[in-house]
């Protein structure tokens, strides 16, 4: 394929310096804006609130919003964002725990309506926290094949045909069965109706 990098866009230093061991887990484009999702909370940020960033290229401007994460009481577990997609005036946010098999508890798609208010201009200051609504619990889909429930649902896409697709990431590690699963959940409006 032909192509060339036209521009590299670093994250603002006051965000990038506080990401820790995780990083970006999703990028979505809607109209004139580019959305990014951090996988976990900033190192010194509010507990249980992950950052969603909106970059507007025409103004070379970043804005930051918070999205509340589900909670876990399981030792060694954490909740994070795996992916985002833009659809019908909202971000679809894929949130998951680190658990697999029969222990898996949180594998969900949430809907976060695009905000009509400005976000925080940096990693500092007041962070507007957006409201999320549950759009689909994915555990029934993962269990429907009567196989092993994968830890990492890592891909979410609304394709040009209007269908919603998911994919797992087996990471190729020793504590996973090596299986990758691909799901066609159907037309996005129907897939997220419940």
Locate the predicted segments by residue.
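Sequence/structural signature of beta-propeller domains
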Residues: 1-194
């Amino acid at each position: 394929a032909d192509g060339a990098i036209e521009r590299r866009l670093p994250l603002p230093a006051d965000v990038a310096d506080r990401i820790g061991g995780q990083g970006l887990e999703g990028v979505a484009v809607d109209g004139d804006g580019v959305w990014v999702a951090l996988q976990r909370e900033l190192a010194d940020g509010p507990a249980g609130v992950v950052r969603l960033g909106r970059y507007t290229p025409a103004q070379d401007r970043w804005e930051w919003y918070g999205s509340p994460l589900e909670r876990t009481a399981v030792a060694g577990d954490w909740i994070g964002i795996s992916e985002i997609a833009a659809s019908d005036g909202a971000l679809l946010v894929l949130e998951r725990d680190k658990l697999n098999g029969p222990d898996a508890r949180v594998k969900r798609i949430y809907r976060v309506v695009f905000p009509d208010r400005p976000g925080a201009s940096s990693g500092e200051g007041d962070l507007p926290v957006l409201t999320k609504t549950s759009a689909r619990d994915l555990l029934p889909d993962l269990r429907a094949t009567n196989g092993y429930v994968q830890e990492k649902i890592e891909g979410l896409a609304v394709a040009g045909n209007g269908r919603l697709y998911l994919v797992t990431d087996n990471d190729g590690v020793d504590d996973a069965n090596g299986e990758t699963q691909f799901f066609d959940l159907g037309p996005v409006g129907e897939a997220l109706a419940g």
